[in-house]
């Protein structure tokens, strides 16, 4: 209500770093979490895709295990902090989707990884214009190779990690939205009661009251 924009910083940093808090190894947490907490690193959460949206089970991005590396291919979009983040928590399939009888894909076989801006094969494909306090971008991965040490948790745990992360921060985003709405209503009422025109207050006009 008083500073809804504070939640944007909390939620964006939290979304990007929570997978590390929940499932990252000790070395991974030690490398990134203190920097995020101190405001010295920006995190991003890369889950949504152009064709799948927020339907996580339908994601098409893949990560193929190749010796001591994973090779990522695919796209992510509407990624908050895209283009300015110091690291990205990226979700991709490490095994093909299993089809249910109704034809839908199961969420099994999804894994999570840390990707850094300088990784070869990783590019910011598009900067998305939007009315937002943070940048949005489409990310592209073309044979992007990252060390196996950048796997968050174990293979196949990505869906659970993503849902546990969203369980935390969807709540705070919803609370911020409610706070914005309450503040907007209160500001509108205050203005209507104090704005004079044509010899009356704005609140006294029938159109305002209706």
Feature-to-residue mapping (PLM):
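A structural signal for short hydrophobic beta-strand segments in well-ordered beta-sheet cores
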Residues: 61-64
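Short beta-strand segments that buttress and anchor functional surface loops
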Residues: 46-49, 91-94, 126
